[in-house]
Amino acid sequence: VPQFSSSGTTLDGRIKPDVVAPGVMLCSARAQEASSTQGTSCSSATHDGASTPLYMALNGTSMATAVAAGGVAQIRQYLRESAGINEPRSDLIKALVINGAEDLGVPDIPNSREGWGQIDISNSISPKDASTPLNLFYDDSRELEPGHSFLYQFDLDSSSEMDLSLVWVDQESSLISNQT
């Protein structure tokens, strides 16, 4: 995670970010009319078979956000087309993103630099051993109120792994980003 990236935690103690995405030296579109040519060119970029100055390597949250949004769109599409969930809720998608995230190393996750790790769509929708399809259990029919609990029981094969996430949709925070 580059040093120019913001990190958590929030004023109310939540770990942020939830996950991170690649955002350094990504090949991005450059307007043909742009007067500035600052930035590293994408030497392998071609258009109609010829190299082109229409792409350049850029850094920042604008790059990482596009990677994360594309990944979330793929997860949503998977849930609709393969899992039969016509309108997947954001908290289910968030759980899959968190469960699939790859730890980037020290310090242990979760932490205020990478949250639960770097987004990895393959891990989010495919079991690590790829021998069985993703088996989802989610309960979006009830809300957990303070002081209450729900009990769920699962019968597991001792040779299988289970990833579990309790997620929620965060409440809105301050519009001033350094006061979240």
What name fits each language-model region?
Residues 1-3, 33-36, 113:
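Short secondary-structure boundary/capping segments
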Residues 10, 25, 62, 117-119:
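Gly/Ser/Thr-rich beta-alpha loop segments that engage phosphate groups in nucleotides
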